[in-house]
Amino acid sequence: MAKSKNHTTHNQSRKWHRNGIKKPRSQRYESLKGVDPKFLRNMRFAKKHNKKGLKKMQANNAKAMSARAEAIKALVKPKEVKPKIPKGVSRKLDRLAYIAHPKLGKRARARIAKGLRLCRPKAKAKAKAKDQTKAQAAAPASVPAQAPKRTQAPTKASE
């Protein structure tokens, strides 16, 4: 069987320090030696319940906090609101609305332009295509036209 622990050391030091580790009573009020102990006791209670001082302290804290908040506000730039993706009625209109958006559409427009550039025929290919079309146009004029295969001769329609 496990031993039962009557005395715990858990959190004891925290408990001692919560109220401060106190000096012995004889040394507590060195500057007030020879003063009535009852008066000293009352003074302790007065310290605890000194509302006027507390209110002053709270007011000072509030001032300090507001000054700090203003300083932070001056340093930190306001955050921009993120633009939401515009919604259209249909998918096609959705896409158009997205492309037309001033910020969001930048990348989309760039991609579309790139795609168009890639699809466009190159200069050499253009020249080659022109040569081929010229050659094709010249070829049928010199060679007599042949009748296509599997065509039947026109027959007279019976009346």
Swiss-Prot record:
Localization, UniProt: Cytoplasm
Residue positions, PTM N6-methyllysine: 5
Keywords, in A-Z order: Acetylation, Cytoplasm, Heparin-binding, Methylation, Phosphoprotein, Repeat, Ribonucleoprotein, Ribosomal protein
Single GO cellular component term: membrane
GO MF term set: cadherin binding; heparin binding; RNA binding; structural constituent of ribosome
InterPro entries attached to this UniProt entry: Ribosomal_eL29
One Pfam short name: Ribosomal_L29e
Bias type Low complexity, positions: 134-149
Family under the similarity heading: Belongs to the eukaryotic ribosomal protein eL29 family.
Name this protein carries in UniProt: Large ribosomal subunit protein eL29
Organism from which the protein derives: Homo sapiens
Upper lineage: Eukaryota, Metazoa, Chordata, Craniata, Vertebrata
